[in-house]
Amino acid sequence: MSIAKIAGVVLGSAALVAGHGYVSGAVVDGQYYSGYDMSYHYMSDPPKVIGWSTDATDLGFVDGSSYADADIICHKNAKNGAISAEIAAGKQVELQWTDWPESHKGPVITYLANCNGDCATVDKTQLEFFKIDEKGLISGSDNTWASDNLISSNNSWTVTIPSSIAAGNYVMRHEIIALHSAGNKDGAQNYPQCLNFKVTGGGSDKPEGTLGTALYKDTDPGILVNIYQTLSSYTIPGPALYSGSSSGSSSGSSGSSSAAPSATASASASATAAPVQTSTATAYQTSTAVASVTVTGSSPAQTHVQATSSSAAASTPTASSGASSGSGSSSSSSDLTDYFNSLSADELLNVIKQTLSWLVTDKIHARDISA
């Protein structure tokens, strides 16, 4: 077996074990709201939370073959969140993900849709989403993406609710699009997450939106793209950013968002203050301050988030797992083969050792919200 095949098997297995992520909760004005924990799927009477439920218990994705189907809206067979988190227009919400694999690089995008009534009963296929936040390629020279910023910010992302939108009930659609297999048609992996918010105050804007089933096409330049080449720019998928969105509203490690649908590579920024472990939910701000927060929900999500790993394997192109669409095509296989064959035996062994160490010994809980 060739070096490339051996490395592909090892790193592909690592991707399967590491899994993907989902939004476990949100922090608003110092208060923690549980999202939909995957363990709730097996409960006869799960807690009422702001996060929409989903059948994606394998932490899987939606690919381009389902862009016209309802699953792309809020994930597979998603059902409405039962309650809403109240937030004033102009305020920030911190969205907390479970551990996200570094190999799954791509943009982070956030939308809102006015429910025009109760979000607990709204028909998701009728929701019209307008984009309030986006970030894509950070640096083409070292292949740094918005997802890397999210990881370095303790797997969290902060979004500002536009101050100009009208008060009302909104569904937030927050999403990472993983591009590690996107060199192949339908290889991009969408991980949409939906949460309910009651927006207070604000202005009078009621932005026009786009149905969730019309947000993307599988041939969009930001969807069908080879990220294993040096990119000088990247076009973020989806409709244009809402004009009332705050510039710099999002925060991975840099705390800025692109101001147009097309994002151009810029210098990578440093990470925020290092996270700490507590027995309660913790809001990680983009400054040195770390604030304790209270927990809302009949049962807090029993989710733990992995601290950023130093694994070299996670930052290199990995062989797609069995869940990845189009992983066997010649395009991505050639890219991976060239990369692995360029490594010396010692370098390859080091990549494998660090991957196994990350999987077995280095996993720690960066947040504990199960107090």
UniProtKB/Swiss-Prot annotation:
Q: How is the cofactor bound?
A: Binds 1 copper ion per subunit.
Keywords noted in UniProt: Carbohydrate metabolism, Cellulose degradation, Copper, Disulfide bond, Glycoprotein, Metal-binding, Monooxygenase, Oxidoreductase, Polysaccharide degradation, Secreted, Signal
Q: Which Pfam families match?
A: AA9
GO cellular component terms given for this protein: extracellular region
Upregulating conditions:
Expression is up-regulated on steam-exploded bagasse as carbon source compared to glucose.
Which residue pairs form cystines in this protein? 74-194, 115-119
The segment annotated Disordered runs over 304-332
Q: Where is the composition biased (Low complexity)?
A: 307-332
| Localization per Swiss-Prot or TrEMBL | Secreted
Keyword Protein biosynthesis present in the record's keywords: the answer is no
Q: What is its EC number?
A: 1.14.99.56
Q: Which N-terminal stretch is annotated as signal sequence? A: 1-25
Binding positions (O2) = 180, 189
Q: What does this protein do?
A: Lytic polysaccharide monooxygenase (LPMO) that depolymerizes crystalline and amorphous polysaccharides via the oxidation of scissile alpha- or beta-(1-4)-glycosidic bonds, yielding C1 and C4 oxidation products. Catalysis by LPMOs requires the reduction of the active-site copper from Cu(II) to Cu(I) by a reducing agent and H(2)O(2) or O(2) as a cosubstrate. In addition to cellulose, also cleaves the beta-(1!4)-glucan backbone of tamarind xyloglucan, irrespective of substitutions which contrasts with AA9A xyloglucan cleavage activity.
The entry assigns this protein to a family as follows: Belongs to the polysaccharide monooxygenase AA9 family.
Q: Write the protein's name.
A: AA9 family lytic polysaccharide monooxygenase B
